[in-house]
């Protein structure tokens, strides 16, 4: 019989799946739920040693002798401190010791609670990985607990062996921690990592998947090897490859697609319609908001990640395999093992939805400006964008696959886009372009103090505020929005550039913009800054209108009762009233 405490169930299940059976136990209350659950499980071999210092050294010797991971389990507070000497020894000698340290409620720390010290990462510098596991109260806690324990156990022998710490929090409800009322231990998700693998067996899994979705994150495929490997992969498997512009995969293959605004307009019903059996991801950050829907609505999906450093990235909450290698090597190896063919059924599901995406006639706004700008970008241009609207809208609008797109989307900060762009531009002979907002430019204005090359082209959209906050809230919801939240201002960038090394241009409407862009993309003696003036609230409304125009049903797809009600409301109220209600309701 096992405890019903979820975090302990997850821990026990993963210890069994990682084949970690030896546990050296010291007495205590906090670890009672764990100890009582494993002592009658024939899988585990338990040893009782009262003194924690001695127990840890005993486990050290056992692990060294058997060349397998060995756990030590103790109660909270100073009991855990007694593990220090053996943990340090294990770290220096590369021995797989697992410190299972039970802990108190963290909210009570330093508030006169008995036996309560700071145990989180207490062995810092002496362990390869330390995780702090909360008590599981909801699905998010469960996912986090599962992920953290997987990460710790995977690190035991990743690029060399060594000790890890799993610190888990327990209540002091004596009845709860001493109740064992679960007959069958629930099996939790295990994550496997491969530095080398049997690609034939991996291919056998892939070929049985009917709906395979490959997702490409930010990346730069300089040689084209990844593109070529993906092209062959799409021919052999029932898959779709989705890459935003920042994946920089230049291919005319129709099965390698940019979902553009789909993540912002897709419904729960459509997520179910497009739900994959398996996701294979590569690259860094994937910007499309599709990634937020998959954990919520795609309940039957498995995720494999390809990443060179082997780091765990469980962004879709369903990661089961990590392949520590270059993505082109993975796909090439799979291609060599495969003789299948894409039946295109899953591809046509995506194509049917993407073919419905369109730009309606746009009022003059930042979306209209960015669309026009992207349309005139030359082939092979280098484009750097700031975060949020610049990334989002350029991803909607860029149609030339050879445009190289970059942005600081790792930490997604507003502050350093200009400096990053100027650094990139130094090594380029052709014109290089920056798409930036007014606040982002002001953040980084001192970057313009250096001498600039004539190939610099900066298009700044000045809507006198942070447009993202107008999209999120709007003046109807927060009338004082521009005072502080959106940082409203009356600054014209022209005033910062007069007398500088720039050739300055400006536009206030579409006709002027088209005229200025003709000169903007031509070589010149000086760098050029083009300032385009829009209005923040109008920009937000234009984006919302674009989203609503593209919230359409897929022909022949079953829709939920909730979706049907929304459709009727929109028809009765009209688009303008419906949109207002949709974006202002709490």
Segments the model singles out, each with a brief description of its role:
Residues 82, 216-304, 400-428, 442-445, ...:
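Glycine-rich, anion-gripping cofactor-binding loops and their flanking helix/strand elements
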Residues 5-73, 79-81:
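N-terminal cofactor/phosphate-binding cores enriched in small/glycine residues
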Residues 11-20, 62-67, 155-160, 199-212, ...:
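Glycine-rich phosphate/diphosphate-binding loops that line cofactor/substrate pockets in enzymes
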Residues 100-149, 243-349, 451, 473:
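Glycine-rich, acidic loop regions that bind phosphate or pyrophosphate groups
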Residues 100, 107-120, 396-582:
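Thiamine diphosphate
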Residues 1-2, 294-389, 508-585:
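Phosphate/pyrophosphate-binding active-site segments
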Residues 8-16, 26-30, 34-39, 350-429, ...:
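Active-site diphosphate/adenylate-binding microenvironment
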Residues 22, 65-74, 80-82, 90-97, ...:
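Structural signature of the thiamine diphosphate
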């Amino acid at each position: 019989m096992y405890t019903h405490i979820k975090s302990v169930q997850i821990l026990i299940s993963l210890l069994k799946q990682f084949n970690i059976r030896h546990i050296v136990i010291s007495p205590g209350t906090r670890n009672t739920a764990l100890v009582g659950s494993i002592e009658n499980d024939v899988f585990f071999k338990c040893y009782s040693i009262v003194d924690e210092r001695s127990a840890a050294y005993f486990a050290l010797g056992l692990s060294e002798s058997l060349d397998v991971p060995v756990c030590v389990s103790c109660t909270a507070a100073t009991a855990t401190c007694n593990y220090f000497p053996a943990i340090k020894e294990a770290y220096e000698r590369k021995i797989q010791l697992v410190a299972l340290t039970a802990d108190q409620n963290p909210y009570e720390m330093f508030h006169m609670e008995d036996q309560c010290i700071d145990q989180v990462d207490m062995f810092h510098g002496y362990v390869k990985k330390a995780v702090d596991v909360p008590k599981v109260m909801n699905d998010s806690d469960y996912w986090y607990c599962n992920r953290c324990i997987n990460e710790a156990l995977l690190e035991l022998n990743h690029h060399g062996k060594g000790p890890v710490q799993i610190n888990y929090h327990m209540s002091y409800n004596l009845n709860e921690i001493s109740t064992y009322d679960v007959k069958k231990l629930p099996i939790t998700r295990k994550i496997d990592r491969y530095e080398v693998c049997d690609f034939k067996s991996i291919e056998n899994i892939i070929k049985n998947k009917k709906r395979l979705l490959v997702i490409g994150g930010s990346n730069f495929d300089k040689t084209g090897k990844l593109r070529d490997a993906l092209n062959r992969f799409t021919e052999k498997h029932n898959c779709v490859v989705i890459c935003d512009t920042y994946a920089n995969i230049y291919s005319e293959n129709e099965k390698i697609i940019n979902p553009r605004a789909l993540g912002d307009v897709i419904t729960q019903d459509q997520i179910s319609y497009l739900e994959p059996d398996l996701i294979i991801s590569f690259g860094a950050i994937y910007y499309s908001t599709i990634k937020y829907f998959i954990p919520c609505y795609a309940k039957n999906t498995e995720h494999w990640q390809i990443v060179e450093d082997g780091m765990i990235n469980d962004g879709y909450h369903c990661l089961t395999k990590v392949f520590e290698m270059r993505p082109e090597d993975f796909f090439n190896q799979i291609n060599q093992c495969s003789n299948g063919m894409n039946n295109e059924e899953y591809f046509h599901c995506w194509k049917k939805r993407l073919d419905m995406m369109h730009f309606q006639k746009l009022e003059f706004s930042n979306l209209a400006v960015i669309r026009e700008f992207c349309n005139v970008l030359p082939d092979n241009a280098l484009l750097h964008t700031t975060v949020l609207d610049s990334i989002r809208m350029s991803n909607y609008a860029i149609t030339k696959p050879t445009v190289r797109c970059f942005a600081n989307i790792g930490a997604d900060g507003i502050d350093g886009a200009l400096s990053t762009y100027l650094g990139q531009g130094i090594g380029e002979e052709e014109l290089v372009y920056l798409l930036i907002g007014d606040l982002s430019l002001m953040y980084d204005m001192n970057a313009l103090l250096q001498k600039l090359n004539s190939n610099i082209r900066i298009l700044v959209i000045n809507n006198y505020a942070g447009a993202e906050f107008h999209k999120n809230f709007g003046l109807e919801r927060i009338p004082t929005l521009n005072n502080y939240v959106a940082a409203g201002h009356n600054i014209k960038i022209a005033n910062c550039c007069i007398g500088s090394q720039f050739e300055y241009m400006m536009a206030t409407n579409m006709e002027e913009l088209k005229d200025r862009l003709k000169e903007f993309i031509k070589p010149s003696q000086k760098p050029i800054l083009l300032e385009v003036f829009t209005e923040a609230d109008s920009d937000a409304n234009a984006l919302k209108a674009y989203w609503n125009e593209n919230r359409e049903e897929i022909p022949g797809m079953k829709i939920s009762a909730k979706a049907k009600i929304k459709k009727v409301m929109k028809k009765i109220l009209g688009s303008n009233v419906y949109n207002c209600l949709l974006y202002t309701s709490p």
